UniProtKB/Swiss-Prot annotation:
Residues 582-623 are annotated as: Disordered. One of its GO terms (molecular function) is ATP binding. Signal peptide: none annotated. Belongs to the heat shock protein 70 family. Residues 614-623 have a biased composition (Acidic residues). PROSITE patterns: HSP70_1 (PS00297), HSP70_2 (PS00329), HSP70_3 (PS01036). This is Chaperone protein DnaK.
Length: 623
């Protein structure tokens, strides 16, 4: 069976892993890093950049650079570039496609299957959007699993004995707090809570706002109106946040950040850990509510938690570690990389699906309650939050009016008592109900959640047997034709990228050959004939002309012709060099024979002529 790729599709960065020899191995990017920046950019010439290349040019191209798209998953948000609108699924697919290509290059084989992680608190729309992104990228998404659960898999693969663990997953854009019981290869999620709009990006925004305010106070210039300056400031804020996890102060230095009539302005500011912690305190305090909710839903107390696992870059910050220690009264685990464990766990789940990993059972839960709208705009729950998945639940409802021949099923997700306060997942109609007084028809509504946490809903009139099954069609979902179109677009992009790469390689090969030909002509002298020199010169000129056209096939043909000529010349030069070497060897042997004859006519045969005889006297030091 082909390898199953485990992917942590993150807000700021993404990671990937595969199973090798029963253990998860992190996949490096083509640039050599152990993570893929979740950044996509379009240059002014229309070229698409993904990952590190996109991040590097963000300062000079902020308006055409897309970051933190994960926060828009499951919404109707669109990015418009050059008149074309891209959904969050399409942008995410570009990131996934880059990961897929680099992983294939790393392991040397085609990858078609993946397990992708999502925040535990993602709703159905967001989960389906993530799965669609994988499909657009050319991946069969075998499973969508929760990030904290994946982290626990990576942490607990070799652990024995029963224990209750809490996973605190604070990433670039989301927070998840998950409590699970682990023992004898069974990972059972007891509860999960979180906030899909809380993460390291919010901390960065606080730092950016503070620095911009201080700069305005000092210079009167508001950097918030300058997109290029703000991108530089964002990079500096993130860097300062990371540095202050290990140092007490850092310097934020951005020369030529802006200019006014008096000339260029430079930003140079000292930022201390104490100031940083004061700035992000409001963000950190928002972490308490999900922690309390998770503990309450699991019907535990804080001191009943055996181990705490930290996941995500921001959990390296001392203020986060101290907050968790204070709340739970114990030190979090430090034995696993918080940036890599989610991807590793996803690859372990891939190993389970492929049959590589045995004796491991994952019992996850749905993070939010699911139900329908009933009379009076009431939210009636069919499946409570933290129900183990996969699961199926049915309930019988009836009509709200006399002679009602159809009913609308309004599917919702959330914890609020009124339907309009929750997230709408979709609406559909069951028609053809025989006219009858209200309350008489029997309509069975069935909710079915698969192992990915994705919902299917069915309504059936028990009197007539008529039923209507749906895949939720909320406005944020993509229909099959949209996905097929986006898959073709992604394949087209991949083909264009491959063509650009091939062109660059062909041009580089041609340049190298031209340099070699030029050097050969200069060094060859009279070792090659005038005809051979002329053929090399003509071949080089033909290749240069082909390069000017930009036609790959013409360049390849001219390169092949010149290569053939150069091979013939190289053969001649090699034979000349070989002949010269043989002549040198013969001359050296003749010289040695002549030297040996002179030694034979001397008075001391066998004596080294370089040794000089000397007299000596023994001296007694004791005299």
């Amino acid at each position: 069976m082909s390898k199953i790729l485990g992917i942590d599709l993150g807000t700021s960065n993404s990671e990937a892993a595969i199973m090798e020899g029963g253990k998860p191995v992190i996949i490096p990017s083509a640039e050599g890093a152990r993570m893929f920046p979740s950044v996509v950019a379009f240059t002014k010439t229309g070229e698409r950049l993904v990952g590190e290349a996109a991040r590097r040019q963000a300062v000079t191209n902020p308006e055409r650079t897309i970051i933190a798209i994960k926060r828009k998953m499951g919404t109707d948000y669109k990015v418009e570039i050059d008149g074309k609108k891209y959904t969050p699924q399409e942008i995410s697919a570009m990131i996934l496609q880059k990961i897929k290509q680099d992983a294939e290059a790393y392991i040397g084989e085609k990858i078609t299957k993946a397990v992708i992680t999502v925040p535990a608190y993602f709703n159905d729309n967001q989960r389906q959007a993530t799965k669609d992104a994988g499909t657009i990228a050319g991946l069969e998404v075998l499973r969508v699993i929760n990030e904290p659960t994946a982290a626990a898999l990576a942490f607990g693969l070799d652990k024995k004995g029963s224990q209750k663990i809490l996973v605190f997953d604070l990433g670039g854009g989301t927070l998840d707090v998950t409590i699970m019981e682990m023992g004898d290869g069974v990972f059972e999620v007891l509860s999960t809570s979180g906030d899909t709009q809380l993460g390291g990006t919010d901390m960065d925004n606080k730092i950016i706002d503070y620095i911009a305010s201080q700069f305005k106070k000092d210079t009167g210039i508001d950097l918030r109106n300058d997109k290029m300056a703000m991108q530089r400031l964002r990079d500096a804020a993130e860097k300062a946040k990371i540095e202050l996890s290990s140092t007490l102060q850092t310097q934020v230095n951005l020369p030529f950040i802006t200019a006014d009539a008096s000339g260029p302005k430079h930003l140079d500011m000292m930022l201390t850990r104490a100031t940083l912690e004061e700035l992000v305190r409001e963000v950190v305090e928002r972490c308490y509510a999900p922690m309390r909710q998770a503990i309450s839903d699991a019907k535990l107390t804080a001191n009943q938690i055996d181990r705490i696992i930290l996941v995500g870059g921001p959990t390296r910050m001392p203020i986060i570690i101290e907050t968790i220690k204070k709340f739970f009264g114990k030190e979090p685990e430090r034995g696993i990389d918080p940036m890599e464990c989610v991807a590793m766990g996803a690859s372990i789940q891939g190993g389970v699906l492929a049959g590589e990993v045995k004796d491991l059972l994952l019992l996850d839960v749905t993070p939010l309650s699911l139900g329908i709208e009933t009379l009076g705009n009431v939210a009636t729950r069919l499946i409570e939050r933290n129900t183990t998945i996969p699961t199926r639940k049915s309930q019988v409802f009836s009509t709200a009016a006399d002679n009602q021949t159809s009913v609308e099923i309004h599917v919702i997700q959330g914890e609020r008592p009124m339907a309009y306060d929750n997230t709408t997942l979709g609406r559909f109609h069951l028609i053809g109900i025989p006219p009858a007084p209200r309350g008489i028809p029997q309509i069975e509504v069935t909710f079915d959640i698969d192992a990915n946490g994705i919902l299917n809903v069915k309504a059936k009139d028990l009197g007539t047997g008529k039923e209507q099954a749906i895949t939720i069609t909320a406005s944020t979902k993509l229909d099959k034709s949209d996905i097929e179109r986006m898959v073709k677009d992604a394949e087209k992009f991949a083909a264009e990228d491959a063509a650009k790469k091939e062109k660059a390689e062909v041009m580089n090969q041609a340049d190298t050959l031209l340099y070699s030909a030029e050097k050969t002509l200069a060094d060859a002298g009279d070792k090659i004939t005038a005809d051979q020199k002329e053929r090399v010169t003509k071949g080089s000129d033909a290749l240069r002309e082909a390069q000017k056209t930009g036609d790959i096939e013409k360049i390849k043909a001219a390169t092949a012709d010149l290569t053939k000529t150069m091979n013939e010349v190289a053969t001649v030069l090699y034979q000349a060099a070989q002949q010269q070497y043989q002549q040198q060897q013969a001359a050296e042997q003749a010289a040695q024979q002549q030297s040996g004859g002179q030694q034979a006519s001397g008075s001391n045969p066998g004596k080294d002529p370089n040794v000089v005889d000397a007299d000596y006297e023994v001296v007694n030091d004791k005299k």
